[in-house]
Structures are given as C-alpha cells and as structure tokens.
C-alpha cells in the first residue's frame, strides 16, 4: 500500500526494527515527508525485507523549508510534515499532490511516535543489519557529533572520552574508524577518519564493527540492533532530561537496565 512517512534516520532504524514482516511486505510506495527523505530513500533501495516497495518520493529541500516556514519557523532547517499534526499533514499531502489518495483511502500513514511508545510492539529484527554487506576486518567504530546540530542538542567529546577509546583500541589492537561530517583533530594512536561516507557504507560499518562508541545518533540506534551491551559506549545528549519509554525502546532489543549501562554522560565503563 502507498505509505506516508515523516521521521529521522535514527527513527527509521527504530521503526524498521519493530515492524512485522507483514507490515514491511504491505508497503508498495513511500512518500518521505521529511528533510532527510532523500537519505532514507537510498537506504531503502533494494531492501529485500520490503519486497513490494516499487517507488519512493521525496520533497526538495528548498520546497520543504518554504512550506515549513509558514507552520513553524523555528523548525525550518529540520522541516518535516508529520501525520499526527493535522496542519503539517495537510501540507505534506499537498506537496506530494496526494490529497485524493488519502481521501479515497488509498494511502496509509505511519504514526511513528505512537508506535515507538507502544509496548505491545516488541523488537522484530533490523532489516538493515540483516542485509548489510560483510566487512572482513576488526575495528572500533566511533561516530563524532555532527557539526550542523546546535551544540546544546548533541554531545561534545572530551579528552577523557578519547582516552578511553584509545585505550580500548590499544588493548584489543584494533584501529578506530571515525565517522565525521568535517575535518577534525583525532587524538588517537590508530585510526582512519571517514568524512561523510556513503550512508549505505555507514550501515555496513555499523553492522560489522566490534565496538561502537560516540554520540547518541542514528548510528548508535542501529548499533544497538547488532552489538551486546558491553561493546557499546554512547554519550548522552546534553539536553537529556531523564529516562523514558521512547529512549529505552530506541535501543531495543536491549532491556532498560542494559540501556542505562550503555547510555551515559561519558564514554567509558
């Protein structure tokens, strides 16, 4: 069925892991009503767990920004037209020119926030991990905070964080693959800096890493679908306000107790 979706990349990895096989197979077309739709379109291309997905549609960035400015000027740079907010949803339908599809019940929406909080939806599997390409290497994957997010919205990496990762690297004799979106100084003994690698390659890197460390991001959510708790070190966002069901479930299949051990104010044990 034609499907309307509005979420972030990390949310996609979360959503995919709780959709049933039947739900995945029901999707024939996707309308990505969000800024990074073009990234998710690429992620979904050729995904064998969605065998009936034949077409995907996105909104041009400038078009999305202009439309968002009339709804919520503060959110222009991270525009989205969620189906659970009626004015936003109406705007998204109009931009895709699919009002008739909705009115004729030929379109389904995915209310991701409600699904994320639904305890009756257990972890199923990650199709992205399942269909990733094998990498014959041993390494620690480190995701450095993006330069485009406000500093009060994403973790900062300290020398203590770097020191822990360096010691982990030396102990296991593994190099560290550092993913970043710009040139940064990396105070590690053995590393390779990957600047804006292809998103599908990022998935492969996450799926095959021996350890994951870094900021709370889409990489950390995906890593949780592949690694045991003792091989993950995620640094909290500085605007962390406390534990909640959404946060716990984002890191499924780990239990809330395990998430508390993984997700800390520092990178380390």
Predicted regions and their residues:
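An anion/phosphate-binding loop that grips the pyrophosphate of nucleotide cofactors and donors
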Residues: 209
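Short loop/helix-cap segments at secondary-structure boundaries that form the rim of catalytic
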Residues: 41-47, 182-191, 222-226, 241-248
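Short internal beta-strands
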Residues: 27-36, 177-180, 233-235
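A nucleotide-sugar donor-handling region in carbohydrate enzymes
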Residues: 53-59, 83-138
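A short helix->loop->beta-strand "cap" motif at the edges of active sites that frequently abuts
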Residues: 27, 172-174, 227-231
């Amino acid at each position: 069925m034609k499907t309307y979706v509005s979420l972030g990349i990390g949310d996609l990895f979360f959503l995919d892991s709780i959709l049933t096989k039947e739900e995945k197979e029901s999707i024939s077309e996707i309308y990505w009503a969000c800024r990074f739709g073009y990234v998710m379109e690429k992620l979904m291309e050729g995904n064998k767990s969605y065998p009936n997905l034949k077409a995907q549609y996105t909104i041009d960035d400038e078009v999305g920004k202009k439309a968002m400015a009339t709804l919520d000027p503060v959110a222009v740079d991270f525009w989205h037209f969620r189906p659970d907010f009626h004015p936003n949803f109406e705007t998204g339908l109009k931009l895709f020119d699919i009002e008739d599809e909705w009115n004729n019940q030929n379109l389904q929406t995915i209310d991701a926030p409600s699904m994320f909080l639904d305890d009756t939806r257990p972890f199923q599997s990650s199709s992205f991990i399942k269909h990733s390409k094998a990498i014959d290497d041993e390494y620690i994957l480190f995701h450095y905070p993006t330069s485009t997010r406000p500093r009060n919205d994403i973790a900062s990496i300290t020398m203590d964080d770097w020191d822990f990762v360096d010691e982990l690297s030396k102990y296991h004799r593994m190099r560290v693959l550092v993913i970043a979106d710009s040139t940064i100084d990396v105070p590690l003994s053995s590393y390779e800096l990957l600047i804006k690698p292809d998103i599908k390659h990022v998935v492969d890197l996450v799926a095959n890493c021996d350890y994951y460390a870094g900021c709370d991001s889409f990489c950390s959510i995906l890593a949780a679908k592949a690694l045991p708790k003792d091989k993950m070190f995620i640094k909290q966002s500085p605007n962390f306000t406390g534990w909640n069901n959404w946060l716990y479930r984002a890191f499924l299949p780990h239990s809330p107790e395990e998430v508390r051990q993984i997700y800390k104010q520092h990178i380390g044990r």
